[in-house]
């Protein structure tokens, strides 16, 4: 979360009030609006943040959500603002209300890990670009290497092919040798590409968890 395009589309289709009503949690429009209104009146950042999370989770009602990820557009924006407390609020809320683990997607893994560690968020799930040539790895390749070796967290590697800049065999062989990586996320244009990538992962990472494509 969040899926930003749905908010823009809802505003176009239903107007501002209609969009708000569609995305408020099921405890009731008035209760949720009052909670949000009181939060704004009191400048209660925690109340506002939890309301936004609950609104986003409404579409998943009745489904198991073992991990709830905060998208990098939000994570990196909060990092840039220095609003680190938002990560603690998010983590505590998804654990307490949804019995889920918080996940964080970022383009600056080293900086995020330092912040999460300072907040006391232990062994976090972090999805980030991790590849052999440092493609879109903000903070620098060496900082990522140190973090993977020294930090206690569960890494999900994405952009492992660096948008096609690294041959598949070379990319998978390298990422499978890195410490602390628990999963690999990749995109594929067809079944054959998925199968060949899966075979490479099985070859270089025989004890790997399930592959996500």
Mark where each language-model region is.
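Active-site beta->alpha loop and helix N-cap motifs at the rims of alpha/beta catalytic domains
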Residues: 1-81
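Beta/alpha (TIM)-barrel catalytic core signal, keyed to glycine-rich beta->alpha loops juxtaposed to Asp/Glu
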Residues: 51, 62, 66, 74-213
């Amino acid at each position: 979360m969040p899926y930003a395009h749905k908010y823009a589309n809802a505003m176009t289709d239903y107007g501002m009030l209609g969009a708000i009503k569609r995305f408020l949690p099921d405890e009731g429009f008035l209760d949720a609006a009052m909670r949000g209104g009181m939060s704004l009146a009191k400048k209660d950042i925690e109340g506002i943040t939890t309301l936004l999370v609950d609104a986003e989770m409404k579409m998943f009602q009745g489904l198991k959500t073992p991990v709830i990820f905060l998208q990098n557009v939000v994570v990196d924006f909060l990092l840039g603002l220095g609003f680190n407390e938002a990560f603690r609020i998010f983590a505590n809320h998804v654990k307490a209300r949804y019995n889920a683990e918080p996940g964080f997607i970022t383009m600056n893994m080293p900086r995020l890990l330092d912040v999460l560690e300072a907040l006391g968020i232990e062994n976090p799930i972090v999805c980030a670009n991790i590849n052999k040539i440092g493609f879109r790895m903000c903070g620098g390749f060496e900082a990522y290497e140190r973090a993977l070796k020294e930090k206690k967290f569960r890494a999900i590697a994405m952009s492992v092919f660096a948008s096609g800049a690294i041959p598949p065999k070379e990319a998978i062989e390298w990422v499978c040798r890195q410490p602390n990586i628990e999963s690999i996320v990749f995109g594929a244009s067809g079944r054959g590409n998925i199968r060949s990538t899966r075979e490479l992962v099985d070859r270089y990472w025989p004890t790997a968890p399930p592959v996500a494509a």
